[in-house]
A protein has these predicted regions:
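Active-site and channel-lining beta-strand-loop segments
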Residues: 18, 142-144
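…primarily DNA-binding HTH/wHTH and HhH modules…
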Residues: 145-171
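Short Lys/Arg-enriched helix C-cap and helix-to-coil transition segments
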Residues: 135-142
């Protein structure tokens, strides 16, 4: 996935980033421990991208992400994603995760069952652990069996996941 540009922006959980191509977002970055580390992570993920002002469609996506993280019920389904280079199974997992409404959760096994692969819960978890579009592909809404929080690969780990779920629940 080749990004043309990226930008950082403020949210209730910290300074996030997005990178984009002509076809949509190619990546979303949750906050690192500092703005510098978030920027460095974006440069690491998208070395050919320039930090620049976003085009109008990306500005709209950023505004929707900010609103969702403020607790507004928005599924972000209208945000275009450029999944060029995303493995077919991962793409299917991300598409299934995008159907989980804000404030709701599913287990990894539930997502696997929706894909017609009920024994693929671990593979679903691995795909979500590599999710290049956190928030827009709401991997935070997918839990381990029995309602356990499961893992979360973003900075802050499961505490960040719990915070995102609480924001969606209006807490």
């Amino acid at each position: 996935m080749t990004a043309h540009g990226f930008t950082l922006f403020d949210t209730t959980i910290g300074r996030c980033g997005v990178a984009w191509s002509d076809r949509g977002l190619v990546g979303v970055q949750l906050p690192e421990s500092s703005e510098k580390m978030t920027r460095d992570r974006m440069l690491q993920r998208f070395p050919a991208a320039a930090e620049t002002a976003p085009p109008p469609n990306v500005r709209i996506a950023i505004d929707e992400i900010i609103a969702m993280l403020r607790g507004e019920r928005n599924d972000l389904a209208a945000i275009a994603l450029d999944m060029d280079g995303v493995a077919p199974f991962h793409r299917r997992v991300y598409e299934a995760a995008r159907t989980i409404p804000p404030g709701r959760t599913l287990a990894y096994g539930d997502v696997a069952a929706r894909l017609g692969a009920p024994r693929a819960a671990r593979a679903v978890g691995q795909a979500l652990g590599r999710n290049p579009f956190p928030i827009v592909v709401p991997c935070h809404r997918v839990l381990a069996a029995g309602g356990k929080i499961g893992g979360f690969s973003a900075h802050g780990g499961t505490a960040t996941k719990r915070r995102m779920l609480a924001l969606e629940a209006g807490e």
